[in-house]
Regions:
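Electrostatic interaction modules used in gene-expression and signaling proteins
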Residues: 122-124
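Beta-rich carbohydrate-recognition and catalytic domains
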Residues: 1-50, 59-113, 126-176
């Protein structure tokens, strides 16, 4: 789980992968009982077709909550992308990067776990986002992104077809 840095609508919110497969937003009044998690409705791109997850707490921007994500694609390649969630209703995805922001470069592909770049968070520095990241579970790197360029690389998400949606209530998965 990754907590949002402030309450929204009087409630605490957190990013989760409660079902082990889907990025979702859960909320609670007391930080102890997280009953409902709402899956984030976005289609899956090729670079994240095997697995998706979040990469640390959201960053609050005037435009929305910026969420770094990781995706696993062909050859178990881990890449980093981003979502933009509505400020007042963080279960609504208002933007996403179609292409990853960061992928393993040729000189970063060998290591304990090959083909992996992964982060557990980021830091906003004015108009930039500093992203520390692990490389192949063997090295560490830092990337700096212009927030404006991340937002410009986003487009509105397309919802997944209804047959692929799943809703989880109190730990039970219910398919449409």
């Amino acid at each position: 789980m990754a907590l949002f840095p402030r309450r929204i609508g009087g409630r605490y919110h957190a990013l989760s992968r409660h079902d082990g497969a889907t990025n979702a937003v859960a909320s609670t009044d007391d930080l102890t009982i997280w009953r409902d998690a709402t899956p984030l409705e976005v289609d899956v791109a090729g670079w994240e077709v095997i697995h998706v997850g979040n990469c640390g707490p959201p960053v609050e921007l005037a435009e929305g909550w910026l969420v770094l994500t990781h995706g696993v694609g062909p050859f178990r390649t881990y890449s980093i992308g981003a979502l933009l969630l509505d400020l007042d209703e963080p279960t609504i995805v208002i933007g996403r990067t179609r292409q990853p922001l960061l992928t393993p470069q040729p000189d970063e592909q060998d290591g304990y776990v090959p083909n992996v770049v992964y982060t557990c968070g980021s830091l906003r520095l004015g108009d930039a986002l500093l992203v520390p990241f692990g490389i192949a579970d063997a090295n560490i790197g830092f990337a700096t992104f212009s927030i404006a360029e991340i937002l410009a690389a986003m487009d509105a998400p397309r919802a997944r077809p209804a047959r692929e949606r799943a809703v989880t209530r109190a730990g039970a998965r219910i398919d449409d």
